[in-house]
Curated annotation (Swiss-Prot):
Subunit structure: Homodimer. Heterotetramer of two MnmE and two MnmG subunits.
Residues reported in the UniProt entry to bind (6S)-5-formyl-5,6,7,8-tetrahydrofolate: 26, 86, 125, 456
Name of the protein in its database record: tRNA modification GTPase MnmE
Biological source species: Streptococcus thermophilus (strain ATCC BAA-491 / LMD-9)
Alphabetized UniProt keyword annotations: Cytoplasm, GTP-binding, Hydrolase, Magnesium, Metal-binding, Nucleotide-binding, Potassium, tRNA processing
GO cellular component, one term: cytosol
Designated gene of the protein: mnmE
Keyword Glycosyltransferase found: no
EC number(s) from the headed UniProt entry: 3.6.-.-
Length: 456
């Protein structure tokens, strides 16, 4: 997809393919209204008011294809800042595809993935952070993730970054003035103090923003959560309890979970990617052995480990091994089967375990409370009006910007001339511009929009 601004008219189906009540075929571009008017029988779309919905039929060679409602939106007050037409059809693969092909035959071009959002970016309707927020909103798995995405779409991150970049420019301009007009004896000291003060101010701001990354990334991507334990302690039953559906195979036979099962579940606004692992033990079964190896890998990569023990049986060597290999993880120990007489030796276990009964659904809510304690210090997940970093690209760029600011600090400590330190300060300004797209390379922008679905 070329990054250069284009003016041809594009079209795509904007709703998921399949059976449904409504389907939407979208056009955007200079000729969007004229092309739609060619295939629409009803009011003349080229003369109707902007932001109106018009009843009629889509026809080809006087044959009715569908009864539709057509939305006409004139530039610049549209998502793409171009003329936009949305044809609301009856849902279904055949009718939406037929209308799409008719529009292409009438002069439109098939849109590439993300091209509508790309045009909104190129035409200045949104910046790159807002474009990425569109995708985050589509992919949001919980209401909290949706709130963060909507805030970014509304411009919270854009405004913070743009304001910081402007302050950096103001600082650089003041330094230039002081360098160009060195009439005063103390101008060098004043300039050095200014740069030191502003650099520390920018560092504090970006460090505070970076501090939100852990929470933001969890809300966006979820916590990779490995459920581990020896065979038949209730791992799959716990998974099904959290999911509230029979996803894993639950039997009384050891080793029935032979692979890694992954599912998402919403825990108080946090998407947990639950990984039910095969029981970690020595086995001669080839298929089960593969599952065990995958389980060990899942344990290494997990953000959170739920270690399930059987409270109705004494600790085994396998239990002790699992306690040992998971001790450096963010771990919650669960004593399952508390509905049965206790036989486990709790004196060998850490104090912060949670007794549960998956069978009777007892104390499952305490798992959710412990997760909140582990990852969010019992604080609310999303603070009102707060700006969160949740995108790995943004996090990486903020870290690079902080490195450039630290280079300025180090230069000041070494007594380097301020005019030489302008290079690192300018680099900070450029890096922050990559976040919003003001200084992002074409290849990055092209790659970003290619991840979008067709019609968005």
């Amino acid at each position: 997809m070329s990054i250069t601004k284009e003016f041809d008219t594009i079209t795509a189906i904007s709703t998921p393919l399949g059976e449904g009540a409504i389907g939407i075929v979208r056009l955007s571009g200079t000729d969007a209204i004229a092309i739609a008017n060619k295939v629409f029988k009803g009011k003349n779309l080229e003369t109707v008011d902007s932001h109106t919905i018009n009843y009629g039929h889509i026809v080809e060679n006087n044959e009715i294809i569908d009864e539709v409602m057509v939305s006409v939106m004139r530039a610049p007050k549209t998502f793409t800042r171009e003329d936009v037409v949305e044809i609301n059809t009856h849902g279904g693969v055949a009718v939406t595809n037929e209308i799409l092909q008719l529009l292409i035959r009438s002069g439109a071009r098939m849109a590439e993935p993300g091209e509508f959002t790309k045009r909104a970016f190129l035409n200045g309707r949104i910046d790159l952070t807002q474009a990425e927020a569109v995708m985050d909103l589509i992919r949001a798995k919980t209401d909290k993730a949706m709130t963060v995405a909507v805030s970014q779409l509304d411009g919270s991150l854009k405004n913070l970054i743009n304001n910081t970049r402007q302050e950096i420019l103001n600082t650089l301009a003041q330094v230039e003035v002081n360098i160009d007009y060195p009439e005063y004896d103390d101008v060098e000291e004043v300039t050095t103090n200014l740069v030191r003060e502003k650099t520390q101010e920018f560092q504090a701001l970006l460090e505070n923003l970076l501090a939100t990354a852990k929470r933001g990334k969890i809300l966006r991507e979820g916590l990779s959560t490995a459920i581990i334990g020896r065979p038949n302690v209730g791992k799959s039953s716990l998974l099904n309890n959290l999911l509230r559906e029979e996803k894993a195979i639950v039997t009384d036979i050891e080793g029935t979970t032979r692979d890694v099962i992954e599912e998402y579940v919403n825990i108080k606004g946090v998407p947990l990617k639950l990984i039910d692992t095969a029981g970690i033990r020595d086995t001669d079964d080839v298929v089960e052995k593969i599952g065990v190896e995958r389980s060990k890998k899942a344990l290494e990569e997990a953000d959170l480990v739920l270690l399930v023990l059987n409270s109705s049986e004494p600790l085994t060597d396998q239990d002790r091994t699992l306690l040992d290999i998971s001790q450096n993880s963010n771990r919650i120990i669960l004593l399952n089967k508390t509905d049965l007489p206790q036989a486990i030796q709790t004196e060998e276990l850490p104090e912060d375990l949670i007794p549960i009964s998956v069978l009777k659904n007892e104390n499952i809510d305490k798992i959710e409370d412990r997760i909140n304690q582990l990852f969010f210090d019992n604080a609310g997940l999303v603070e009102k009006d707060a700006t969160y970093l949740s995108n790995a690209r943004h996090i990486s760029l903020i870290e690079k910007a902080l490195e450039s600011l630290e280079a300025v600090n180090q230069g000041l400590e070494l007594g380097m001339p301020v005019d030489l330190l302008q290079v690192d300060m300018t680099r900070t300004w450029e890096i922050l511009g990559e976040i919003t797209g003001d200084a992002a390379p074409d290849e990055l922008i092209t790659q970003l929009f290619s991840q979008f679905c067709l019609g968005k």
